[in-house]
Amino acid sequence: MEVTAIKNSSKYIIAIHNNTNGEFSAKSFNNYSHAAKVYISKSKDPDDFFIVTQLPDFIFFKRHNQNVVLQSKSAADDGSLSIYCQKNRIPYINVEAQYGHKKQQILMLLICQKLLSGAGK
């Protein structure tokens, strides 16, 4: 597959990742140059969060009371997929959940589906 095959701004790349309790969370991005905006819900575990590259997606997840981080456009290129997507204007969402939070991660994926289907905007 050629890399150019994914350079379509109407298609999203969704990454799914797990973390360990307290090691990596939405709080990790407070006062961090990689984050343009951070929203942490008072009712959600900060270990379960989204990383997005587009402001409308940040607003969508915030409006749905989900922990969400908007990656900064000036974030250093560390070779990550999110940086690649942002530089190439490919919408990107990382669904990050604590290991063992399978139910929460499934709910997060359903919220992604809602975003992608245009429902709830």
Give residue ranges: language-model regions.
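Structured catalytic-domain cores with a bias toward divalent-metal coordination
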Residues: 1-121
